[in-house]
Amino acid sequence: MAVTKEEVVEFISNMTVLELSEFIKELEEKFGVSAAAPAAAMMVAAPAAGGAADAAEEKTEFDVILKEAGANKIGVIKVVRALTSLGLKEAKEKVDGCPSTLKEAVSKEEAEDAKKQLTEAGAVVEVK
């Protein structure tokens, strides 16, 4: 009598957290594997490989945050519309609601370009 996958899943789903934890430990020992997520394993291995490399690692994604609109509010709204493809009302709400995030997870070049355009229009911008 063979056990089906569905029966195994049903059995595991009825286990308590403690039972499941012990079950996973037994499987890890029996098969010589780890149930840790690959990303977590890489984070643990990276500092061991070279702590100095982490400090030198450059951030690849940036957020563009509008801190203040400045005196030329209309000019800033125009730039916000061009950068974000928002409508006039939405762009005005972003500018009026400072501080507000205009772009998230963009490249360094795109973030610097947006900052330059907004600063030229009179806005105060922060890139994180």
Curated annotation (Swiss-Prot):
Keyword match DNA damage: no
InterPro entries the UniProt entry points to: Ribosomal_bL12, Ribosomal_bL12_C, Ribosomal_bL12_C/ClpS-like, Ribosomal_bL12_oligo, Ribosomal_bL12_oligo_N_sf
Pfam families cross-referenced by the UniProt entry: Ribosomal_L12, Ribosomal_L12_N
Cellular component per GO, a single term: cytosolic large ribosomal subunit
An example Gene Ontology biological process: translation
Keyword Acetylation among record annotations: no
SUPFAM superfamilies found in the cross-reference section: ClpS-like, Ribosomal protein L7/12, oligomerisation (N-terminal) domain
Keywords associated with the record: Ribonucleoprotein, Ribosomal protein
Molecular function (Gene Ontology), one example: mRNA binding
HAMAP family in the cross-refs: Ribosomal_bL12 (MF_00368)
Function: Forms part of the ribosomal stalk which helps the ribosome interact with GTP-bound translation factors. Is thus essential for accurate translation.
Subunit structure of this chain's protein: Homodimer. Part of the ribosomal stalk of the 50S ribosomal subunit. Forms a multimeric L10(L12)X complex, where L10 forms an elongated spine to which 2 to 4 L12 dimers bind in a sequential fashion. Binds GTP-bound translation factors.
PANTHER family documented for this protein: 39S RIBOSOMAL PROTEIN L12, LARGE RIBOSOMAL SUBUNIT PROTEIN BL12M
UniProt similarity note: Belongs to the bacterial ribosomal protein bL12 family.
Record's protein name: Large ribosomal subunit protein bL12
Native source organism of the sequence: Desulfovibrio desulfuricans (strain ATCC 27774 / DSM 6949 / MB)
